A protein has these predicted regions:
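Non-catalytic signal-transmission and effector/linker regions of two-component phosphorelay proteins
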Residues: 1-10, 131
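Two-component/phosphorelay signaling modules centered on CheY-like receiver
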Residues: 18-36
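The feature encodes the CheY-like receiver
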Residues: 21, 63-64, 87, 91
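Acidic catalytic/metal-coordinating carboxylates
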Residues: 39-43, 65-69
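Short amphipathic alpha-helix used as the core "switch/output" element in two-component signaling
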Residues: 46, 68-80, 97-100
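Active-site beta3 strand of CheY-like receiver
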Residues: 51-57
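C-terminal output helix
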Residues: 91-93, 111-121
Length: 135
């Protein structure tokens, strides 16, 4: 069974800020990841119903549906989905709520791409372990 490597990891980036989506998309593709983007939670859920992703990176503070609500809906669809949350309004209650809700990791904006890459490496190893269990 072929293991998931970092470069094979598929990632969905969800943020209502086009600049954040663009920077993450370009930075992660440059590292060899397969990256798609969504501008809001509804678009993300539609994309997740059509395509498989190993990881979702989502903003917490978005318009019609928060990243916390998106996190909950994704976990209902796929409890093993690795979800990273990011926000410029990080408060302890936000962090606790997301981590208790099943977030894999939490990032503060402005993002440090190095931190994201380290966490994605860990997520890739975790995805590889899960794939061996289900092969």
């Amino acid at each position: 069974m072929k293991k998931t490597t970092d470069a094979e990891l598929s990632i969905l980036v969800v943020d209502d800020d086009e600049n954040i989506r663009m920077v993450l998309h370009q930075s992660l593709e440059k590292e060899g990841y397969h990256v798609s983007t969504a501008k809001n939670a509804e678009e993300a859920l539609n994309t997740l119903q059509r395509s498989f992703f190993h990881v979702v990176i989502t903003d917490i503070m978005m318009g019609e549906m928060s990243g916390v609500e998106l996190l909950q809906q994704i976990k209902e669809m796929n409890s093993l989905m690795q979800i990273f949350v990011m926000t410029s309004h990080s408060t302890l209650p936000n962090v606790i709520q997301c981590m208790q809700g099943g977030a894999y990791d939490f990032f503060e904006k402005p993002l440090k791409i190095e931190d994201v890459l380290i966490s994605l490496g860990e997520a890739s190893r975790r995805a590889a372990r899960w794939s061996t269990l289900y092969s």
